[in-house]
Amino acid sequence: MAPKRGSSPAIAGHCSLILSRGLPSVRVTDSNRQKKLIRHLHTFLLYLPADTSCGYRPECGAASFRTRQSSLMVSSEMPNTSTLRLCTVCASNNNRSMESHRVLKEAGYDVSSYGTGSAVRLPGLSIDKPNVYPFGTPYNDIYNDLLAQSAERYKSNGLLEMLDRNRRIKKAPEKWHDSQKVFDFVFTCEERCFDSVCEDLMNRGGQLNKIVHVINLDIRDDNENAKIGGRAMLELVKALNSKMQECDQQGVPFEDTIMDVVADWQQAHPQLPLLYSPAYY
């Protein structure tokens, strides 16, 4: 069922929609009842400003946002005291996830990065012959291999600069499915990576009963858009971290408020469609 547009809950609290895995869409008019449903039914609360439309993906329990206008208020800079464990994910753990890794690391966050592809694939000297490497191949080795193939070609398309950045951050690209680390937030950079992460977490069985928030930002796979996406991801992380600290101080469950944060962020970044799904370790 396609949700109808309404007014922002900041203006009219009656226009809220609850979307739940395996449950029909439910409209709720009372804010206290909203919170109870979120806590007890493990639902996803989505606020719909008048200029926002949304979609729900029952196959992965994800809420998606599409916004046409921007009105996010940027908070003043504060020292980073976050203890969040973050993760960025793209297909090959080379461009988008590594640029976001760099940005978040330089901002002082505890961050790791991974790829979900079957192998690391980078453009080759011809379109039909990409360079393919196993995950775990050191960035320095990949750099030297491309340098030997054609320094001029790979310098002009930015691959050598990208790999030089990567080898300064960590040793080699890592595969998501081989990682046993536990994160608070996982940020993927395209929908197929989001689906892969959600499916893998579901297959792990959730034995730790530890919630993880999986968020996808649809970032185009080129140098410039990777930088744009990295900056936007940092802005989202700052907003989420600030809200978590606020919730801790007020004794409010963060899960009740996360959709406010992502909806505000999406208004400011309509060019980066967002998908969200909670999952469990």
From Swiss-Prot:
Keywords: Hydrolase, mRNA processing, Nucleus, Protein phosphatase
Source superkingdom: Eukaryota
Enzyme class: hydrolase
Role according to the record: Component of the cleavage and polyadenylation factor (CPF) complex, which plays a key role in polyadenylation-dependent pre-mRNA 3'-end formation and cooperates with cleavage factors including the CFIA complex and NAB4/CFIB. SSU72 is required for 3'-end formation of snoRNAs.
Principal subcellular localisation of the protein: nucleus
GO cellular component: chromatin; mRNA cleavage and polyadenylation specificity factor complex
Name of the molecule in the record: RNA polymerase II subunit A C-terminal domain phosphatase SSU72
Keyword ATP-binding appears in the UniProt entry: no
One MF term in the entry's GO annotations: RNA polymerase II CTD heptapeptide repeat phosphatase activity
EC number: 3.1.3.16
UniProt record similarity statement: Belongs to the SSU72 phosphatase family.
Assembly mode: Component of the cleavage and polyadenylation factor (CPF) complex.
Catalytic activity: O-phospho-L-seryl-[protein] + H2O = L-seryl-[protein] + phosphate; O-phospho-L-threonyl-[protein] + H2O = L-threonyl-[protein] + phosphate
A GO BP annotation: transcription elongation by RNA polymerase II
Subcellular location(s) of the protein: Nucleus
InterPro entries: RNA_pol_II_suA
